């Protein structure tokens, strides 16, 4: 057993403390890479070409914002295009007051087939440069969630599973991300105040994913993890598929000098703290343990129970929560922050 019983016994107290005593300031810093990829590791597609809407799929951002007034926010945007529907959803979380807002809107595909410009109504994600990557924009104009964020490709790619492709339930999925992009723009708080982004203390994780067929039949949990004062960026997948009897647990870790590790892991959701979904009969855990083979052990906690984006179906609904964590990397103590995403492909089996 990779996670000891002693560790399990101590997680509840640690998790509660992390959730209730989050620091007032997190260390949000962009990277300053000159190129996003050096080409030594072969991938199966061109990053710029994959931005085209003709590939369909998912365009997603999570922006870790520090305002020029010192306030900090997590801002999420997501555009998904499927053969059945198209949606844009977004959320904002004030990391000090824990004021949370979210929305989802459905519409027809209005994407440009060659240049990245995907939107539903007055909400979307677009490229501002001809290469579809160097500079992008995410924006939302909902009654309770309003932002206009621009981010530059100043971060080296994290290519999931090493080559940017892996089995996702019954199908193949392709996924890559830019984990620490320089960010500017503005966010509007609940009171209508416009917060200007401080580019030196903010960054965006951009994620691009598309596939060949249906998603996994079960649920999936994904963690994005940042360890300040190190170069490690972690993309952690837990994927369940009862139809194929495939249960994947792996982490893609980007380190120094474009070093990639793809490692198996053990994970444990802890249900001592939970959040009851307002959309379905789902009880989300708010604490987790990860034991990444040969790398480290982590205890993660959501800082707020309700961080659900609520749709009318399972695939439209997601728990997109800011998390903090304690742990060890190669036996050295670390702390960090990131995000957890929990999605169910259907609610029929619940």
Swiss-Prot record:
It comes from the Eukaryota. Glycosylated. The gene is khs. This is Kievitone hydratase. Converts fungitoxic kievitone to the less toxic kievitone hydrate, and thereby protects the pathogenic fungus against this phytoalexin. It holds the Pfam family Lipocalin_9. The lineage of its organism: Eukaryota, Fungi, Dikarya, Ascomycota, Pezizomycotina. Homodimer. Its EC number is 4.2.1.95.
